[in-house]
């Protein structure tokens, strides 16, 4: 559930980023480790920077969170659409990938590719499931919010 929902239906979300340390020793001397909380969730995310930029590889970084948000939104949008269409989804795994561009201009995530492998109970044909995957992509609010193109390349299999 959102942090709050206005009477007009607008959802509001909040997050708090906290860091402590010192940048007094220069660029190479400060910790990138920080924490994100987002009420009402109780769990905090322990984050860092990309290891190539001095971060801790054992922690997630912001770029991974952007990718994870796109993947999670696609998953949840698809499951909702499949359930409404009475399609029995029995498995879903997305091996998603983002690429960072360092061309001219500021660095940015240049592309996100979602590769969901979806298992469904026998019944619907592959084309129907693929149409629902693409409909879910059109309805995914995270993908719709990003300036970066998000591509979905589904694979559909049937459970026994």
Where are these regions (language model features)?
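Extended beta-strand/beta-hairpin segments
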Residues: 1-68, 76-160
